[in-house]
UniProtKB/Swiss-Prot annotation:
The gene is CA7. Its EC number is 4.2.1.1. GO terms for molecular function: carbonate dehydratase activity; zinc ion binding. This is Carbonic anhydrase 7. It catalyses: hydrogencarbonate + H(+) = CO2 + H2O. The active site is at residue 66. Its cofactor is Zn(2+). Keywords: Cytoplasm, Lyase, Metal-binding, Zinc.
Length: 264
């Protein structure tokens, strides 16, 4: 077992087993998906996406046994996403990553069948309508997750502060202070996106997410990517299992429409 709660990414507890504990895994709006770019519907009514992130709202960095996660102060609307397909602001709660063992897999969403080495998820919640993140996470319009693909190539200078902190959270269950990191530095120049109704990609797999997947990837170096792959699924006392391939494969679209903010 690579995780707590009886789920992980191993042979015996990986995505193909999740439906036993979480039947919604076979639901009608599951994520991720394969985005077929030619079938995405250009929607001129979609608003431009605005990510208004204040500089000093990050709190901590954690290895939760499934990913590495940076948590934020979400007590007010200082760090929000607005526009796009959303009505009103959604507050940033945390961001985390999914990645592969090698560069040919790692992302959760795929585009025309192509995987990227990694995918960043910025998780936001609808604080106008719901009083807690937990309440929002089980409501159909409760969450908005911005997905950013990572490819490898040139070094990403802003990513160094994050990758240089990973040694502090190598083991599952470890946490370190991580203040004043603005995730705006991890966004690509273009705000073009695809959007569709979906779910969390980890248990409980709640169908509460408006997905906003940015078209343009960001680039990090193989050295930086290697620091993610040196994290462990396991605690300090356990046999070491490297944290790699922590992604769920694409799920059936089941009639959902993927909208695009741009003309193909």
């Amino acid at each position: 077992m690579t995780g707590h709660h009886g789920w992980g990414y191993g042979q015996d507890d990986g995505p193909s087993h999740w439906h036993k504990l979480y039947p919604i895994a076979q639901g009608d709006r599951q994520s991720p998906i394969n985005i077929i770019s030619s079938q995405a519907v250009y929607s001129p009514s979609l608003q431009p996406l605005e990510l208004s992130y204040e500089a000093c709202m990050s709190l901590s960095i954690t290895n939760n046994g499934h990913s590495v996660q940076v948590d934020f102060n979400d007590s007010d609307d200082r760090t929000v996403v607005t526009g796009g397909p959303l009505e009103g602001p959604y507050r940033l709660k945390q961001f985390h990553f999914h990645w592969g063992k090698k560069h040919d897999v790692g992302s959760e969403h795929t585009v025309d069948g192509k995987s990227f080495p990694s995918e960043l998820h910025l998780v936001h919640w609808n604080a106008k309508k719901y009083s807690t993140f937990g309440e929002a996470a089980s409501a159909p319009d409760g969450l908005a997750v911005v997905g950013v693909f990572l490819e490898t190539g040139d070094e990403h200078p802003s990513m160094n502060r994050l990758t240089d902190a990973l040694y502090m959270v190598r083991f599952k269950g470890t946490k370190a202070q991580f203040s004043c990191f603005n995730p705006k530095c991890l966004l690509p120049a273009s705000r073009h996106y695809w959007t569709y109704p979906g779910s969390l990609t980890t248990p409980p797999l709640s169908e509460s997410v408006t997905w906003i997947v940015l078209r343009e990837p960001i680039c990090i170096s193989e050295r930086q990517m290697g620091k993610f792959r040196s994290l462990l699924f396991t605690s300090e006392d356990d046999e070491r299992i490297h944290m790699v391939n922590n992604f769920r494969p694409p799920q059936p679209l089941k009639g959902r429409v993927v909208k695009a903010s741009f003309r193909a």
